[in-house]
A protein has these predicted regions:
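Long alpha-helical, hydrophobic tracts
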Residues: 1-75, 79
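Beta-strand/loop nucleic-acid-binding surfaces
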Residues: 9-35, 99-115, 119-156
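OB-fold/S1-family single-stranded nucleic acid-binding modules
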Residues: 43-102, 112, 130-175
Length: 175
């Protein structure tokens, strides 16, 4: 089972409730994006050929996750706290807004739940926050903007697919 943090029509960032691990679940058949903090049943695909080897959190699902309920932000805390990105480390292992695709080896995370100490500001499709004494302005994916709470405290940062040889940091969910 999954605690969905955010996503799109063919993927979601989630916490696997059985293991507590952060996962980027992907599936073939499109479905409406699941709202953050949705509890969903997953069916892991036997063949993981769709999983990207440089994205250690990738998991291929046989079917889209099936929503079975929702939880509150307060209840989700017990699953979110252990997967928070360490504040001593750069976002996704790199200080800049992008990572050269050829440098990705699968040893650094490609998905992170971030709790910026100064909060998050969202305006004009960008999330602005400070992390390690650097102000970041990352694009927010449209489904995340649609489902954003009024005052987000956390965000889910992931890497975009490669574009011009780089994977860009984007905000996949606002919590």
């Amino acid at each position: 089972d999954l605690l969905v943090l955010g996503g799109g029509r063919r993927w979601c960032a989630a916490i696997h409730l059985g293991t507590g691990a952060l996962a980027s679940a992907r599936w073939e058949a499109p479905c409406p994006p699941l709202a953050p903090l949705t509890l969903a049943r997953d069916t892991v695909a036997v063949d993981q050929h769709g999983a990207d080897p440089v994205r250690p959190e990738d998991v291929a699902l046989a079917l889209p996750p099936e929503p079975v309920g929702r939880t509150t932000r307060r209840r989700a805390e017990r699953w979110l706290r252990p997967v928070l990105h360490p504040d001593r480390e750069h976002l996704l292992g790199s200080p800049g807004p992008a990572v050269p695709y050829w440098t990705l080896t699968g040893t650094a995370p490609s998905l992170a739940v971030v709790h910026p100490p100064g909060g998050v500001r969202v305006a004009r499709g960008q999330a602005r926050f400070r992390w390690r004494n650097v102000t970041h302005a990352l694009p927010v994916l449209p489904p995340a903007l649609d489902a954003a709470p009024r005052r987000p405290r956390r965000l889910v940062v992931t890497l975009s697919p490669p574009r011009a040889g780089h994977c860009y940091k984007v905000v996949a969910a606002l919590l």
